[in-house]
Amino acid sequence: GNKWKLLILRNLLARPWRFNELRKSLDGISQKVLTDCLRSMEEDGIITRTVYAEVPPRVEYALSELGESMRPIIKSMEEFGLNYKSETADN
């Protein structure tokens, strides 16, 4: 499930997401794998899980302070990937 964590982080950089929004945005991820990734990332302190007292229940996942501190690293990785993709497309 680790290959999904970077994609989850990429989404959470933009805004908080609900579980089904994340699942639909990550083509090919199973519900179990997404659940496991989110739990692991929450346990590691990278994301937060907020449950709202609403009917139906609403749960949102967002970057924690630790997760936010990873923003420059993730952005650098994204830039590298885009540059690499561009260079390999030219060859």
Give each language-model segment a name.
Residues N2-V33, E54-E60:
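N-terminal helix-turn-helix DNA-binding core of bacterial DNA-binding proteins
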Residues L34, L38-M41:
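Basic amphipathic alpha-helical segments that dock to polyanions
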Residues G45:
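Glycine-centered, phosphate/nucleic-acid-interacting loop/turn motifs that mediate DNA/RNA or nucleotide
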Residues R49:
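Short beta-strand "wing" residues that participate in macromolecule-binding interfaces
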Residues A53-M77:
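Basic, amphipathic "hinge/linker" alpha-helix immediately C-terminal to the N-terminal HTH DNA-binding motif
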Residues K85-N91:
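HhH-family (HhH-GPD) DNA N-glycosylase catalytic core used in base-excision repair
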